[in-house]
Amino acid sequence: MKLREVLQHPGEIIPLLQMMVMAYRRKRKPQDPNLAWCWETLIKVSRSYVLVIQQLPEVLQDPICVNYLVLRGLDTLQDDMAIPAEKRVPLLLDYYNHIGDITWKPPCGYGQYVELIEEYPRVTKEFLKLNKQDQQFITDMCMRLGAEMTVFLKRDVLTVPDLDLYAFTNNGPVAICLTKLWVDRKFADPKLLDREDLSGHMAMFLGKINVIRDIKEDVLEDPPRIWWPKEIWGKYLKDLRDIIKPEYQKEALACLNDILTDALRHIEPCLQYMEMVWDEGVFKFCAVPELMSLATISVCYNNPKVFTGVVKMRRGETAKLFLSVTNMPALYKSFSAIAEEMEAKCVREDPNFALTVKRLQDVQALCKAGLAKSNGKVSAKGA
């Protein structure tokens, strides 16, 4: 975190300090060395995710930490381009059969995940300490996710429905299994079990933001990883690899705004899902990443920096949003504020201007109606 950046935004100093205090107070300090290693590793591979997990009821924190590391191993296997696709398919399909084997570790590893893979049996030891029901949740998740991941090792993303499916394959099974866990612990409405579509939209919204933000890294891979659908980029470019070239900036921005506008359609079902979460900690666990995704869309909109590096929100901005998520009315206000802010910077010359504005106005109207409904419930209780 840069001091100059903090001083340039003094309104973010207090939220940053509050976040630091919260992180310190909620830091897990397990006595068990393997469990302590799991938490330390989670901090290394996904620092931002740690504080979200720490919002959960204490009974869920260790299982979700272990779950994340198990899935990170699976994700590392999926993305390891050093392994030919035809060899990765059976490995992904069989992954779930090995997560209880203390002698096994995923046959992959690169970058920041090398230590996780090398020490993977430590994750297995903690997995085996979980109750049988939590072990089964994680096993089911890996079985379904591994199967879904193989789909796009064999096919390309050509259409918007393909993008929906790709975003779902990387997050959907996780969202569905976590929903079952929330309901099983009586932290969410059982009706969510009949609405896998809502879990799917939660997953797709998160998945698409990652696909959008990682475009430069993906097209520079050898061979390139093409997750933006040709149905979108083909309207502006002949070759998606041109999207990072300065001479194609106008076309690249139109393409970017198009795919961002597509992602906005997931917001309504995401809000419907979060309305059905009862527990405050689980609510925050679900709501914070979705809110950050909308904020990231706003930051990325018409932003050429998407094609020159990774676009990130300031830590102070992140802290303010994180602290704003206290309940559903507060979430409505935050979603509406970001949508209004993004609408104000929409570019009239953009080919998708009208649709982008409409979807953002729909979000604001939805949040306004949700707030009115919430206020009505409060009034009824007080009557």
UniProtKB/Swiss-Prot annotation:
Record key words, sorted: Magnesium, Metal-binding, NADP, Oxidoreductase
Top EC group: oxidoreductase
Reactions accelerated catalytically: C30 botryococcene + diphosphate + NADP(+) = presqualene diphosphate + NADPH + H(+)
Binding site for NADP(+): 47, 72, 213, 312, 314
Annotated GO biological process: farnesyl diphosphate metabolic process; lipid biosynthetic process
UniProt entry tagged with the keyword Magnesium: yes
Assigned EC number: 1.3.1.97
Positions annotated to bind Mg(2+): 75, 79
Database matches in SUPFAM superfamilies: Terpenoid synthases (SSF48576)
Xref: PANTHER family: FARNESYL-DIPHOSPHATE FARNESYLTRANSFERASE, SQUALENE SYNTHASE
Stated name of the protein: Botryococcene synthase
Lineage: Eukaryota, Viridiplantae, Chlorophyta, core chlorophytes, Trebouxiophyceae
Gene: SSL-3
